[in-house]
């Protein structure tokens, strides 16, 4: 297909046009009094949102060259969202300011490479300043403040997220799901839970709840199938002498072995239950090792020289309580050593850091949570489907921002952290006048977020910026109350990770567009039904989630 090519200022002007259109739609959502954006859907009701990344994802421009500029700006927003979970609108505002000021200077004859070097040097100095000024997040109240701000000042959501962090800890898994009703509430699963249920309903000890509950249980962990009862018999005899119940976790328990276990359970000879091992392939082996570390047991594996018929009580793990239903097994109070659990947790953290796969990182994070904390589910309710979608996106953003705050601390919000970082730019060393222009571009951009927040509130941005600059420390403009004061004391906070990532990505995208000398795109086609908007592409589709466990079969009881 024939292409169109634009060079120099023509290329940059076309890109800038797309940047401005994208930024104009996104930046109106910034701040507690940001405006709504209505998104048309191909089917169903339109979506009404104040979420910057949701707006950005929807934008595809009709003209191909401006659309490329819009998609490049979208990358700055999306990268910030990926890195820190929030800050997409701030990144958009910063990037637009850098790009527009940079385009003016390059058009006036400045060397774009030197301008870019100045931008990069200034941004790095500001990031260092932000890290040094960061205030660690400790305590439920501070976490609630951060979550509330990220949730567009919804106190109820902020309190729920703070409760979730308090219950499962920093390493716990917190997920967001759609509730079946209109209430938003928190569910917490303590201990280690995996998606495998009992292999026979005859293992149930609580017929009302249809659960098998084992107190002070031994746990046998075997990485192969159990079919021959003779292999299992020696360890069963040893456990029966202790009067403690036994949970068997194996690749499968079938035939004679399962039938014998059921008979012994029904006769009261042995308190026992059996479940399939969680996971598949290599991940199954890793999860069995996790269970062994948590409970102080050993994975019985012939590959490692352990045989089931030679197993002793020393091989078995122990837990205060095991609860098994048709679909899940939950182990609470595992008696593994704290040192070994901590070492295993650190090992998984390292694997997360080294992994390049989003899916692998997600599964590793789940394993980490099962060992180190627990699993909390925020169930989001709403009266209508559009409201549900918007509310869920809001909670997900707030959760991500809160995680970022716990990771790297917080700074005064409302754009104040950027203004206080202006002094650090004076220390940037430059080699020529064009690099100084790059530094000045960042200096100007640092004022843009507060200016936009003030304008969205209905105030004159320049006046608000000057008044805050005249103050010191955490003094700033609280857009929610439309008053000036100490923002940290008022709970107006931004996660350092979000503030930092927004500037880093804005500077990166800005420098890239300023040094663009040519743009190549398909020719405009009047007969093209899609309007030519697909050039830049939106976000790639997320990877499909795991298949989940198949649950217990539950039908083996007929062998009685």
UniProtKB/Swiss-Prot annotation:
Signal sequence, start to end: none
Positions of the UniProt region annotated as Disordered: 524-546
Superkingdom, natural source: Bacteria
Keyword field: ATP-binding, Chaperone, Cytoplasm, Isomerase, Nucleotide-binding
Uppermost EC category: isomerase
Residue spans of biased composition, Gly residues class: 532-546
GO molecular function, one term: ATP-dependent protein folding chaperone
InterPro entries, sorted: Chaperonin_Cpn60_CS, Cpn60/GroEL, Cpn60/GroEL/TCP-1, GroEL-like_apical_dom_sf, GROEL-like_equatorial_sf, TCP-1-like_intermed_sf
Entry GO terms, CC: cytoplasm
Residues given in the record as ATP binding sites: 29-32, 50, 86-90, 414, 494
Gene Ontology BP term (one): protein refolding
UniProt cross-references to Pfam families, sorted A to Z: Cpn60_TCP1
Cellular localisation: Cytoplasm
Gene3D superfamilies: GroEL, GroEL-like equatorial domain, TCP-1-like chaperonin intermediate domain
EC numbers for this chain: 5.6.1.7
Catalytic activity annotation: ATP + H2O + a folded polypeptide = ADP + phosphate + an unfolded polypeptide
PANTHER family documented for this protein: 60 KDA HEAT SHOCK PROTEIN, MITOCHONDRIAL (PTHR45633)
Role description: Together with its co-chaperonin GroES, plays an essential role in assisting protein folding. The GroEL-GroES system forms a nano-cage that allows encapsulation of the non-native substrate proteins and provides a physical environment optimized to promote and accelerate protein folding.
Family: Belongs to the chaperonin (HSP60) family.
NCBIfam families, A to Z: GroEL, PRK00013.1, PRK12849.1, PRK12850.1, PRK12851.1
Quaternary structure annotation from Swiss-Prot or TrEMBL: Forms a cylinder of 14 subunits composed of two heptameric rings stacked back-to-back. Interacts with the co-chaperonin GroES.
Protein name listed in UniProt: Chaperonin GroEL 2
Natural source organism: Salinibacter ruber (strain DSM 13855 / M31)
